[in-house]
Amino acid sequence: LKEEWDMTIKYMTTSFLGDELLGVETMTVNQHDVLVSSPERAILECLNLPDASSSLLDIYYIMEGLTTLRPKLVQTLLEACTSQKVKRLFLYMAEKAGHSWYKALKLENVNLGTSRFMITPTGKYINKYNMTISKELAEYE
């Protein structure tokens, strides 16, 4: 899609959040209405990207700045999310970043499953989220 914005916009869809419009908002740009992911949905989409495991520290840098996420929308998205990997990574990063909205989440309503995930072949095991992540991310402060 290339219009008068002097850029190419790549349209992508995902199904891991169920309802395709959950967490999607309308933004007006140059008198055009465009559907965009809310920050709450966008960070989950980043974690769902096929190459996300190679850039988890970069995604964590983004997570650190997401201080104003809406807990009710985050809760709804997490409950709708079908990817246990995405949910575990999101919750790990939110907790690690110390976001106040994290404390408002009802984690007992979020199904994290029981299987163990190895995001990276070598790294640090995070018992609470039953996953192995890169040492770089685990040790970042």
Regions inferred by a protein language model and the residue ranges of each:
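Hydrophobic alpha-helical interaction segments
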Residues: L21-E141
